[in-house]
Amino acid sequence: MARPAQVAIVGAGMAGASAARRLADAGFAVSVFDKGRQVGGRMASRRDRETGLRFDHGAQVLRAHGPAFRHRLDAWRARGIVAPWDAPGTHAAVPDMTAPVRDLLAGLEVHVGRTVTGLTRNAAGWRLALAEASEARVFDALVLTPPAPQAERLIDSMAPGLGAPGFAGLRKAAYAPCWSLMLAVPQELPFAGDVLRPGEGPIAAVFRESAKPGRSGAAPHVTLHASPEWSAAHLEETPEAVEAALLAALGALLGMAIAPTHRRAHRWRYALVTATCGAPYLYDAAARLGYAGDACLGPRVEAAYDSGAALAERLAADLA
C-alpha cells in the first residue's frame, strides 16, 4: 500500500487549519508548523497568569457571508464552540477565540514554537529549515499561510526575487497594523452594550471581554484596539508607551480616570488586510507550493477559511 502524500503547512491560523483539515480528511499526511506558543494566529487569546482572565487580543468575532463558512459556523454553534455575541450574525468563540482553530486541528500533527526560517526543494520534495529544531523529513507539497510579507521572505529564501511567477501576487497584498491593549479594571467601564466604537480618534473599538459567552462570572476586563492610523503612527513605540497613551485616550473618551489592575499591549504588524493578492489562493503546480490566507480574499476570518479550503481542494486534486 502506497504511503499517503506528505504535506507541510506553515502557519496554524485559520487558513492553515482549514487547509490542514481538508487535506487530512482527503487522506493525506499533514504536518503543521507555527512559531507561536499556541495555534490560532490572529485568532489569538492570552490568559493572564495572575488573574486567570482571558483576553482575545486579536480577531474578536466570526461572521459568515457565504454558505461554506456559514455551514461551519452552524456546526460549531451546535457543539458549543461558538455562540452569538454583540450583534445579529456575529459569534464569539468559547472559551476563547482559538477554539475554532483548535477544533479544525484536532487529531493532526501540529508543532508550535517552531519557526520556519528557510525552504529548499529538490527532486525528492520540500525541506524546512527551523530555528528551534532540525526537521529531516521531506514533504511532497508545501502550503504557506503566514502574512504575505513573511511568506514572501520564505519563498525568497529558496528563490530570490520570487522566481516562481505564480507568487508575484504576494507583493500586491497590504496590511494595516493594530496595537491591542488588554485591561483588567475594578468595575465594568461605563459604555452601552458590549462593544464601544467611537468612530474617530486613537481608539477603534473597546470589547467587553467579560460579557462574551463562556466568560460568566469573570471579573471586568476589556480589550482595546487602536485605530489603524494611530497604530501606524506609533508602530515602533515601546509597549509601555503605547499602554500609557491608549489608557489616557480611553480615560478621555469615557470622561473618567481608569486605574487598571492589569494592562498589557500587543502589536499586530499585519493586522488588517487593506489590499489583496487578487486570487483565492496562489499556487505553483509544478513545485506543489501554495499560499493561502486572508491576504487572498479580504480582511475576514471567513476569507482565511475559504482561501485555505480552496487551496487544499486544488492541492488534493494534484496529489491524487
Model-derived regions, located:
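Short beta-strand to alpha-helix junction loop
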Residues: V61-A68, V82-L105, E236-A245
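Active-site substrate-recognition segment that forms the wall
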Residues: M182-H234, A241, A245, A249-L254
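Glycine-rich FAD pyrophosphate-binding loop
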Residues: A24-R49
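Central helical "cap/lid" subdomain
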Residues: G40, A141-G193, M256
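A conserved short coil-to-beta-strand element within the FAD-binding core of flavoproteins
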Residues: V112-W126
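Flavin (FAD/FMN) cofactor-binding core of flavoprotein oxidoreductases
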Residues: G251-A287
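N-terminal FAD cofactor-binding segment of flavoenzymes
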Residues: A44-A83
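N-terminal Rossmann-like FAD-binding beta1-loop-alpha1 element of flavoenzymes
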Residues: A5-F33
